């Protein structure tokens, strides 16, 4: 304390944006820089309730899918600040599509190719063309916009940007067809380096969400 963001549920926003700051000022304690009210997590368009029997126990979900998967799903699929519907089926679709098929597939294909054709090493002789540089500069070129969205608690923008980068990295590897470049070692090395560097950057960006 003092907190950059005081995060509370929208149903108690008045108490934490009016009374709580007054208490802090009376006690001469610094105020948070921002108060942000998050929405509710719904089940079937309804607020979860024991009487309705529509509660999803997070501990049960974590036991099956893991904490990282649940955290990823909630951040991606529930727009921060708004109410959001969740279900076990949607969670499975999300983690299978994004983490297994998209991220996992990219990591498996590129590292397996590097192991076979680059002696499991990151190539050090690189000659970049425009397509390579577009991929390598994707995060640095958009860093200011990403920071702005995060500062505004638009967290799902951040994760959707990462998903977009994953699609582009997979497309880049497919389009460049390094398996057809074995007679052009320089080009093969550049493609492998660029793809591995995209995996490194994407993994770094995912770390706050799925450490």
Pin down the residues of each PLM region.
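Catalytic adenosine-cofactor/nucleotide-binding cores of aminoacyl-tRNA synthetases and other
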Residues: 40-128, 133
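Secondary-structure transition/capping motifs at alpha-helix termini
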Residues: 24-33, 152-153, 209
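Helix-rich, typically C-terminal accessory recognition domains appended to large enzymatic cores
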Residues: 90-127, 138-210
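Active-site-proximal structural scaffolding
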Residues: 6, 12-13, 51-55, 63, ...
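NTP-dependent nucleotidyl-transfer catalytic core
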Residues: 1-10, 27-34
């Amino acid at each position: 304390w003092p907190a950059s963001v005081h995060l509370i549920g929208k149903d108690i926003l008045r108490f934490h944006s009016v009374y709580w700051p007054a208490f802090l000022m009376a006690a001469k304690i610094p105020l948070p820089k921002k108060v942000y009210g998050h929405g509710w997590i719904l089940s079937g368009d309804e607020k979860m309730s024991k009487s309705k029997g529509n509660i999803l126990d997070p501990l049960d979900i974590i036991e099956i899918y893991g904490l990282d998967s649940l955290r990823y799903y909630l951040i991606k699929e529930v727009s921060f600040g708004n109410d959001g519907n969740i279900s076990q089926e949607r969670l499975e679709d999300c983690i299978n599509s994004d983490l297994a098929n998209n991220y996992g597939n990219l990591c498996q294909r590129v590292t397996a190719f590097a192991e076979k054709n680059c002696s499991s090493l990151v190539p050090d002789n690189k000659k970049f063309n425009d397509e390579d540089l577009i991929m390598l500069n994707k995060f640095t070129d958009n860093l200011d916009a990403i920071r702005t969205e995060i500062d505004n608690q638009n967290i799902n923008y951040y994760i959707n940007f990462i998903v977009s980068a994953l699609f582009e990295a997979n497309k880049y590897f497919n389009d460049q067809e390094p398996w057809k470049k074995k007679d052009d070692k320089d080009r093969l090395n550049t493609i492998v380096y660029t793809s591995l560097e995209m995996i490194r950057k994407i993994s770094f960006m995912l770390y706050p969400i799925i450490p």
